[in-house]
Amino acid sequence: MIKRYEACFLFKSEEIEYKCSLEEVRKSLEFFGAIDIVSNFIGERALEYPIKKQARGRYEIIEFSMEGNNLKELESRLKLIKNLLRYMILVKIVRKINTKKIKRRNFREFRDNVDKESFKGGSKIETPTGSESTDIQEK
């Protein structure tokens, strides 16, 4: 079964090493049958503690779809990439949104936010007299 995954990669901060490693990760994903690959560069940041003697790293988030049985082989291939400091692969869960619940919640918020003071000082609601009520019933 094809699942949607989201992976976060931490590379060494040097530009050339980063680009080579990122290309190697993409080739590995394509080799194991990943489709719909979307890559987002997060940025270069200082690390809280050194990882493999590196004080800075570049973060990249990649979303892709792939068969679940290929994940172990992909992880074993990622461990061999030299300039990849850390990685984390998560299953991205797609949830269906209940629109009825959202509509009800929005209506309640609208109802609660109505300015109640505008109704107090304005015109009063009049009850129909006897002759007016019979006119309504005839129609």
Curated annotation (Swiss-Prot):
Q: Which Gene3D superfamilies match?
A: 3.30.70.60
Q: Where is this region: Disordered?
A: 118-139
GO cellular component annotations of the record: ribonucleoprotein complex; ribosome
GO terms, biological process: translation
Q: Which CDD domains does the record associate with it?
A: bS6
User: Could you say which protein family the record assigns here?
Assistant: Belongs to the bacterial ribosomal protein bS6 family.
Q: GO molecular function of the protein, one example?
A: structural constituent of ribosome
Gene name per UniProt: rpsF
- Which keywords are on file for this protein? Ribonucleoprotein, Ribosomal protein, RNA-binding, rRNA-binding
Question: What role is this protein assigned?
Answer: Binds together with bS18 to 16S ribosomal RNA.
Among InterPro entries, the record links this protein to:
Ribosomal_bS6 (IPR000529), Ribosomal_bS6_sf (IPR035980), Ribosomal_S6_plastid/chlpt (IPR020814), Transl_elong_EF1B/ribsomal_bS6 (IPR014717)
* Name listed for the protein in its UniProt record: Small ribosomal subunit protein bS6
Q: Where is the composition biased (Polar residues)?
A: 126-139
Cited SUPFAM superfamilies: Ribosomal protein S6
